[in-house]
Amino acid sequence: MTLFNILIIGRSNVGKSTLFNRLLNRSTSIIDNNPGTTRDFKYVDFYLNGLLLRLYDTAGCDLLSPESFLQKDILHINENLLTDADLILFVVDSKNGLTSNDIEFAYYLKKYFFKTFLISNKHDSRKALEDFWEPLSLGLEYSFP
């Protein structure tokens, strides 16, 4: 049976682990308000409509300042996972708005990966509602606020 790899990726503290838990309908990943809670990747295999899926929760990565040893390691791991991904869920934080890291990441994903869905998370604040359409400026083909 074919295994389909789905990768949840984005910068730190955008809600990747929350999305992971919600998609699985259980608390599998640790969730915390402090950035950097997830330091490695986690995955769960499950069936959906007869398809075998592997859903990955990844550590947040900062493409623009990979100076720390941990950040370099995270970038390397995520890059390896990206090459095997059949679908990428790129999560951004609408509450705090897009960052230069989000823009750089979107450019990288558009250039090298075709099956990327943009997930605009944290729409529960006034600022997020005011800037509702901002994530669409990243130009990813599939976008979900």
Regions found by a protein language model. Give the residues of each.
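Switch II of P-loop NTPase G domains
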Residues: 37-40, 52-54, 58-108, 127
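Short glycine-/polar-rich loops that comprise or flank the Walker A/P-loop
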Residues: 4, 84-88, 112-116, 139-142
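Short, glycine/serine-rich, charged loops/turns that create anion-binding
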Residues: 13, 95-96, 123-124
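Conserved G1/Walker A P-loop phosphate-binding module
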Residues: 1-69, 81
